Amino acid sequence: MVTQNKKILIITGSFGNGHLQVTNSVVNQLNEMNLKHLSVIEHDLFMEAHPILTSICKKYYINSFKYFRNSYKQFYYSRPEDVNKCFYKYYGLNKLINLLIKEKPDLILLTFPTPVMSVLTEQFNMNIPIATVMTDYRLHKNWVTPHSSRYYVATPDLKQEFVNVGVPEDIIKITGIPISEQFDEDIDTKVWMHKNHLDPNRPTILMSAGAFGVSKGFDVMISDILERSPETQIVMICGRNKELKRALRQQFKEYANVLILGYTHHMNEWMASSHLMVTKPGGITISEALARKIPMIFLDPAPGQELENAHYFQSKGMGKIADTTEEAIQLITELTQDENALAHMAEQMQDLKVKYPTYKLCRDLLHLLDHSSQFEEIYGKVPMYAKLFIK
């Protein structure tokens, strides 16, 4: 496998950490395979092509979940023909062409929805195979690139969605979403809980404050959960929000069943050791939770990929949507007092769990690479109005 020099170009994006995490998982897996004839390069296309404008767009994207939900909803659910007429389709085109001419890759791997790639495949002459890693659980039009060689998806349902829009069934592989291999490794959860001075036999709620991007309301939420379900224990991950961590630690310092943490490298251990997780339905987070079979409550998911992921997991019995904090507290109370309900949700997750997704994806990727042809020059034309946006 890969007996002659080959190069993979990974196109990613830094709109949220999920796409970068997928990229890192793939790169790390390929490195572990010790392929002497393979080189892998990665580029954040939009940031490199238009750093100032992309930075502004990233801030808008992050704030859209809190302040501009309706405008993001309108963009996400816009019709395909609306996107085709939009400059966004040509965003980063010139940078992408220059990258291909400079690097001469044997294969392009997309870990971020990149509509500009469709411009290359439809309006330019190009013989480079393109593979796409879908990082969510429902299809969005921006993930579809005409004349692609491969799509890697999370579930049979998502594969069928691609087939329904005309993608050939034989180029869609169900590999799961690439995550770290550690989420498939065995963990002694009793040892982990004792190490952190918690009771492994009590229902444990894992809450990730960093996923919500807000600092208020968690003190009341924790207090209400403990009042209604005093037998539970809570692990709160505050991420890099030092002020929130300090405030919560001060408020709950006398509670042996509340653990307040900052940024942690041990989400794997906490997911494996907890019984229920309150989080936002980002593609990577819920894939890690799926691997650990920890049921989830999705608190106020934003319109777009978050809400679509949440609806999918709820439809499969693996999670529940709470539109308000009060709804979330009520669901937590009901589930922590019903072991059978939690166990049933975990069983449902077993049916969709794919072990070692990154390894499976990389094995197929290398097979695809073996059949790639030699790089040829790229040429073509784009509409005149698009030339304003392709630098």
Swiss-Prot record:
It comes from Staphylococcus carnosus (strain TM300). This is Processive diacylglycerol beta-glucosyltransferase. It catalyses: a 1,2-diacyl-3-O-(beta-D-glucopyranosyl)-sn-glycerol + UDP-alpha-D-glucose = a 1,2-diacyl-3-O-(beta-D-Glc-(1->6)-beta-D-Glc)-sn-glycerol + UDP + H(+); a 1,2-diacyl-sn-glycerol + UDP-alpha-D-glucose = a 1,2-diacyl-3-O-(beta-D-glucopyranosyl)-sn-glycerol + UDP + H(+). GO terms for biological process: enterobacterial common antigen biosynthetic process; glycolipid biosynthetic process; lipoteichoic acid biosynthetic process. It comes from the Bacteria. Belongs to the glycosyltransferase 28 family. UgtP subfamily. Its main location: membrane. Pfam families: Glyco_tran_28_C, MGDG_synth. CDD domains: GT28_Beta-DGS-like. It is found in: Cell membrane. Processive glucosyltransferase involved in the biosynthesis of both the bilayer- and non-bilayer-forming membrane glucolipids. Is able to successively transfer two glucosyl residues to diacylglycerol (DAG), thereby catalyzing the formation of beta-monoglucosyl-DAG (3-O-(beta-D-glucopyranosyl)-1,2-diacyl-sn-glycerol) and beta-diglucosyl-DAG (3-O-(beta-D-glucopyranosyl-beta-(1->6)-D-glucopyranosyl)-1,2-diacyl-sn-glycerol). Beta-diglucosyl-DAG is the predominant glycolipid found in Bacillales and is also used as a membrane anchor for lipoteichoic acid (LTA). NCBIfam families: PRK13608.1. Pathway: Glycolipid metabolism; diglucosyl-diacylglycerol biosynthesis. Its EC number is 2.4.1.315.
